[in-house]
Amino acid sequence: MKTSGRLLFLCLAVGLLLESQAHPIADAEDATRNVGSDGTSVELSEILERGQDSSAEKGQRQNDHDVDESGHDIPFPS
């Protein structure tokens, strides 16, 4: 009985540890991340627009792949 109690306690402790790691506590930076300059929340479209802008910039930086004569991408240049 003693061993099963210790095993149960160990499982509960590990479960609580994993649960606390899965949901980090929000800090002040997280609370103000989606707040606009006037103190209201930023619209979803603005957030998505910013994300698309940064994605486009990343795509332009990584757009140095090879293209054959017909204009098709060459997936693995030789």
UniProtKB/Swiss-Prot annotation:
Residues 34-43 have a biased composition (Polar residues). Residues 23-61 form a propeptide. Keywords: Pyrrolidone carboxylic acid, Secreted, Signal, Toxin. It is found in: Secreted. Residues 1-22 form the signal peptide. GO terms for cellular component: extracellular region. One of its GO terms (molecular function) is toxin activity. It comes from the Eukaryota. The modification Pyrrolidone carboxylic acid is found at Q62. Residues 47-72 have a biased composition (Basic and acidic residues). Expressed by the venom duct. Residues 25-78 are annotated as: Disordered. Belongs to the conotoxin H superfamily. The mature peptide does not contain cysteine residue. Probable toxin. This is Conotoxin ba1890.8.
